Swiss-Prot record:
Belongs to the NhaA Na(+)/H(+) (TC 2.A.33) antiporter family. The chain crosses the membrane at residues 27-47, 78-98, 114-134, 141-161, 172-192, 201-221, 222-242, 316-336, 346-366, 388-408, 421-441. It catalyses: Na(+)(in) + 2 H(+)(out) = Na(+)(out) + 2 H(+)(in). It is a multi-pass membrane protein. Its main location: membrane. GO terms for biological process: regulation of pH. GO terms for cellular component: plasma membrane. It comes from Bartonella bacilliformis (strain ATCC 35685 / KC583 / Herrer 020/F12,63). It is found in: Cell inner membrane. Pfam families: Na_H_antiport_1 (PF06965). This is Na(+)/H(+) antiporter NhaA. Na(+)/H(+) antiporter that extrudes sodium in exchange for external protons. The gene is nhaA.
Length: 452
């Protein structure tokens, strides 16, 4: 916060650095707390789906919603609005987080990025192999990517429950791994779950991307103006046959990582505004004070890079709004329609549970170990192999992202329900394993530190 009683202003580098660190802390806090809201939303959906209100619950999400404009009619059911439209905002925030991490975070240098990248690759490959080993001969092979995803909110939420005894470097590794996991999930969705591609849609998406570049070239600062090119990209991807929510990733990755260029420096604007407020003759001029405060807010806004500022504004809405709504819309699985005696259903559930609970920690630990022993990277300070294993257990909490992938992988309702049950059980077991192992990890660390 700026001190109005002094004419000295912090330098630009200091301000930007403080903003970056506070953004990371805010991100971790919001993700951790939102896990509770997600859990409540999922539990409510499960209760409704297995109660006397199950038909009402299902009918609600199939309610059409749209609008007419002359001869133009746009109408989709609520399920589509949540999964294809609302989730675009989630992917927008994910795209901005990826962009920021590449610019100044854990992915900013090859040396820093090797460990989480290798760990994430192991955490994707081993669960996929485990799932395929159970389901290779069936018609449900397309579910291989379901156990590869990580729900960052739940994972960080469990880590937050373990308290400050967990080294901060473990938080950073988990966050970096989850971000890389998001990148791989986006690539998997784009390349493996996009069918009947129509090239004409790519031209529409390209026009939207070109419009973004044009807006940035003429220095449009308002984020609302980018809704139009974002909608064009979204529509283009849908026409192409690629999941339209990935438009959020494209827009997020294009968000500037440097403050908006102005003719007048933001620091100069703030300095002039502070000087104006300190003048005695303006203390009674409310209009003048109001105008000056607006200039200060503009200077404060412009000093922060759009990728940090917009993410900060959207992140709480995504964490406490978009994701709980998604969980409430998709976690409601009716156990009455689930037949565990069916071999197909059983193998889908088994492949996903083992993939999440065993495949994730095994893949992350094994890949990290090989990378360190081969000399590709080193473990960060205060991070041990037991800590990496803890990260592996928490990364097995797939939940919302795994459910999202399962809805793309399975068209058959029975198979989709089986996949969702596998995700819920696997994520729950991974959460319990992570929490239990985390308590053991903390206890052992205390014993080590107490030794003379």
């Amino acid at each position: 916060m700026l001190d109005l009683s002094s004419n000295r202003l912090p330098n630009r580098a200091s301000l930007i650095t403080n903003r970056a660190f506070s953004a990371i802390e805010r991100f971790l806090h919001i993700e951790a707390m939102s896990g509770v809201v997600l859990l409540l939303a999922a539990a409510t959906a499960l209760i409704l789906a297995n109660s006397q209100y199950t038909s009402l619950y299902e009918a609600f999400w199939h309610t059409p919603l749209g609008f007419n404009f002359g001869h133009f009619n746009l109408s989709w059911d609520l399920h589509f609005w949540v999964n294809d439209v609302l989730m675009t905002i989630f992917f927008l925030v994910a795209g901005m987080e990826i962009r920021r991490e590449i610019h100044e975070g854990a992915l900013a240098s090859v040396k820093q990025a090797i460990l989480p990248i290798v760990a994430a690759i192991g955490g994707v490959c081993i669960p996929a192999i485990i799932y395929l080993s159970f389901n290779f001969n069936g018609g449900h092979i397309y579910g291989w990517a379901v156990p590869t995803a990580t729900d960052i909110a739940f994972a960080l939420g469990i880590l937050a429950l373990l308290g400050k005894a967990i080294p901060s470097n473990l938080h950073i590794i988990l966050l970096s791994l989850a971000i890389i996991d998001d990148i791989m999930a986006v690539l998997i969705i784009a390349f493996f779950y996009s069918t009947n591609l129509d090239p004409s849609g790519l031209a529409i998406a390209a026009a939207g991307i070109a419009l973004v570049f044009f807006f940035q070239w003429i220095s449009f600062a308002s984020a609302w103006l980018y809704v139009l090119p974002g909608a064009i990209i979204w529509w283009g991807l849908m026409v192409t046959g690629i999941h339209p929510s990935l438009a959020g990733v494209i827009l997020g990755m294009m968000t500037p990582v440097f403050p908006t260029r102005n003719l007048v420096s933001p620091l100069t604007t703030l300095s002039n505004a502070i000087q104006t407020l300190q003048e005695k003759n303006t203390n009674t001029d409310l209009h003048h004070i109001s105008t000056t405060l607006k200039k200060m807010r503009k200077g404060q806004r412009d000093i922060v890079a759009p990728v940090i500022r917009i993410q900060k504004e959207l992140h709480p809405w995504v964490a406490y709004g978009v994701m709980p709504i998604f969980a409430f819309a998709n976690a409601g699985v009716s156990f009455a329609n689930f037949d565990l005696a069916s071999q197909k259903s059983f193998l889908i559930v088994l492949g996903i549970i083992i993939g999440l609970c065993i495949g994730k920690p095994l893949g992350i630990l094994a890949a990290s170990y090989l990378a360190v022993k081969s000399g590709l990277c080193r473990l960060p300070p205060h991070v041990t192999w037991t800590g990496i294993l803890l990260i592996g257990f928490l990364a097995g909490i797939g939940f919302t992202m795994s459910i999202f992938v399962s809805m793309l992988a399975f068209q058959d309702i029975a198979q989709l329900n089986s996949a969702k049950i596998g995700v819920l059980c696997g994520s729950g077991l991974s959460a319990l394993a992570g929490l239990g192992y985390g308590l053991i990890y903390i206890k052992n660390n205390k014993k080590t530190h107490n030794k003379p």
